[in-house]
Amino acid sequence: MNSEFQSLPPETQEAVKRTMDTMEPAQTPTEIRETLEGTQKGGVKNSIRNCLTVFQRDPLFRGALRLNLLTEQIDIVKPLGWERTSTTLTDMDMNYLLLYLEENYGLTSEKKVQSAIKIVANENRYHPVRDYLNSLQWDGTERIRYALHHFLGADTDEYTYEALKLFLMGAIRRVFRPGSKFEVMLCLVGGQGAGKSTFFRLLAGKDEWFSDDLKKLDDENVYRKLQGHWIIEMSEMIATANAKSIEEIKSFLSRQKETYKVPYETHPADRLRQCVFGGTTNRQDFLPRDRTGNRRFLPVTVYPERAEVHILDDEAAARAYIEQMWAEAMTVYRSGKYKLSFSMEMNRYLNAHQQDFMQEDTQAGMIYAYLEDYIGDRVCSKQLYEEALGNLNSPADWETRAICEIMNTGIAGGIIQGWVAYKSPKRYKKYGSQKGWERVNQAPPEGDGFQEITEEEARQMELPF
């Protein structure tokens, strides 16, 4: 193996060696040409089979073409004799391949060559992140529990540990079982220069497996931002801030696949998600107001002044630490003793913890205050829109839904007491027939409501018996 091969990642070198060991003995171009199917005129037939035979037997190509299951592109994983700047098969690589096949085998059909390349690459598929994770050996030292404090000064409480552990397990699961349901985003909150983005970049293992280019969730080419990446940072939570609604954010994070057709493909295909999303922000109130719950977001505040080391003080040491953290996570993954969700107790903590990061819900507060002073026995959404929120115009549908959400979640959560929704519309003098909410009859006190008094108390009150 030459120096170019030695420069490849160790896990890729091993994969190439395993592939080559399972192949037939190498032959010279002259020997291979004698085995190819010919034409009636004595030439070499331009067929997919002949091209495939060359790619499988020629020592230059053996083990060189592999389908990368992360990027879904074909990689050239060993030197082929010309200068290259990337691993991925390019148009220039195709030119060199066509030239070689023409000069050595008389194969000149570009279409047949391309088909053969796809077949041989698919038969030699590999997944670089899986190879990387499987190659790690844990040294037995616990790091997941302390990593966010070590690099970013975060707390060392159980929540911080469980949040990072859940994120790591989701990332591993998405790689080994693409499309797995995982809709959680670890969100690092703190000032500029704390190392939040660097943490996610180094967490990806290799820079090419990381991306921070996701700016809009409704971009028609959003799949291009996801393809080929494992850890995707939503920098400053720009993508969620640009979302049209909380429902769009929830839908995006919950998605398990993208369906699209890449250039040169005839049919669209389902691309199962292999990535996870991390968020960074310096805003304390970054969480979108969602009265039905924000369980998808796991905020962790960082305090760089408390960190044991800054993550960029020694990048090599930081990468080594994180690599061992992945090795620890792989030990947990292999044991099967993990869940891709919080316990009920941790979810209760999360719900309370998230309040510190939510935008103020002024509308809910105004409605709560209105109900405290209201003496009527029923209300409807239009009434609340006008009288509680002070609007003079008619509410849009989405505004009505927002009011219903405030009322129903407030009642369910115990914030609004003494009210219940009624099913059949009731008529309001000012608002017409409307669904809404009515007061619940207060439970009478125990007994008959009377209190026994003594004869002396009765005489004092001049009550005859």
Regions flagged by a language model, labelled:
Residues M1-E142, E158, E162, N393-W398, ...:
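N-terminal nucleic-acid engagement/recognition segments and initiation subdomains in replication
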Residues I117-Q227, I231, K382:
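P-loop NTPase catalytic core of nucleic-acid-dependent motor ATPases
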Residues L217, E265, R291, P304-A320, ...:
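Positively charged interface segments
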Residues V222-Q227, V262-T280:
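AAA+/SF3 P-loop NTPase mechanochemical coupling elements
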Residues I231-L253, P288-G293:
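Conserved AAA+/SF3 P-loop NTPase catalytic/coupling segment centered on the Walker-B
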Residues I238-A239, N282-F286, Y303-E308:
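Conserved nucleotide-binding/hydrolysis micro-motifs of P-loop NTPases
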Residues I246-A269:
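Conserved catalytic/switch belt of AAA+ P-loop NTPases
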Residues R271-C275, D290-A369, D373:
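Phosphate-sensing "switch" segment of ASCE/P-loop ATPases
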